[in-house]
């Protein structure tokens, strides 16, 4: 490879990569170009040379894709929170289906060439869909700013009007920044070793319009005045909490969360039932598409009244509780104590007596349940982006529940895990759901059915 940094080269884009970048070949060398689209002929400048590929910056487009659109966001190229806003939305959906195909081709689970990968289910109005805002804070020119860090940098992009963020959550964080200035509240800066407010989280219930606000701080700060002003200005705010995180790691939250004002949880609805959300509990970022995602999961698992169901990575119990009136029993686990408290509370509020929730890692709790005699016939897993733990995979291959649905937020770890799972299960179909329009991320529901004959035996 004779390419060098700052060298300018012509390139034809052959496809798009998993991060939404354009991919082409220059003299057999793989070139990644953010912002370029499939089919375009461009001129780019090399920014980084690696062992077997190079990265480049888009300079000019000589032949433009007919699917290229002007991004509506004025800070799109600077922010990095969205990666494919320059691609027409219907083609974004095609791209996300292709992401699944790319991941499967890379990991090659048995029979992947014939998997039924269904068209991505998109949104009619793919704007302002994020019900949860999580912005970092810094001080610039004497004023507090909140936003996202530019990719691979420590530069915070000030965001005043995010086009994918719920409008009320954006208004609240803008007001919070003003009040942090007015009350002279210290703001975190790792380079200057300043302690203070480092992250602002705002979450809104789509069903009730109730809002939670969390200040993540590296030290105790006096928020009394800010809380008084905010709750007077925004009656939708029902909870204000503080989370303490003094670590220098990239983790957003620390272990300790305290309610400073208001109620300890807000109410949300999905599939016609209501449930509680405490500040630290996980819930999907896009409530509208969550309805679609959970409906797809219900259809795929196809439970009966005799089934015993495990809801792994259960969060507040929202998926498992959608099945509770259709099965004999539901068990779930999560590593966040507040989530398990919420799950138990939600089950009780709905009047279910056939549910059980336990705090712990799925890879530890599920083997214990099987050894204790709980024979699950159905399983739904909704793991984090890291996918299924190896210990959990071994457990599933050993005990082999008859039905399984895998809800994935990372196509790469999904494809990796399927390499093991297809030793026991057949992939009936994969349904992609667009939970994050204008980004390179997608969600997928995989229906897995136990093979009639397989090489793995129960132990």
UniProtKB/Swiss-Prot annotation:
EC main group: transferase
Pfam families: TRAM, tRNA_U5-meth_tr
GO molecular function: 4 iron, 4 sulfur cluster binding; metal ion binding; rRNA (uridine-C5-)-methyltransferase activity
Residues annotated to bind S-adenosyl-L-methionine: 284, 313, 334, 382
Binding-site list for [4Fe-4S] cluster: 73, 79, 82, 162
Domain TRAM: from-to ranges: 2-60
Entry-linked Gene3D superfamilies: 2.40.50.1070, Nucleic acid-binding proteins, Vaccinia Virus protein VP39
UniProt keyword Nucleotide-binding present: no
Residues the record marks as active site: 409 (nucleophile)
Source species, domain of life: Bacteria
EC number: 2.1.1.-
Keywords: 4Fe-4S, Iron, Iron-sulfur, Metal-binding, Methyltransferase, S-adenosyl-L-methionine, Transferase
GO terms (BP aspect): rRNA base methylation
Similarity comment: family membership: Belongs to the class I-like SAM-binding methyltransferase superfamily. RNA M5U methyltransferase family.
Name of the protein described by the UniProt record: Uncharacterized RNA methyltransferase SMU_1779c
Species assigned in the record: Streptococcus mutans serotype c (strain ATCC 700610 / UA159)
Taxonomic lineage of the native organism: Bacteria, Bacillati, Bacillota, Bacilli, Lactobacillales
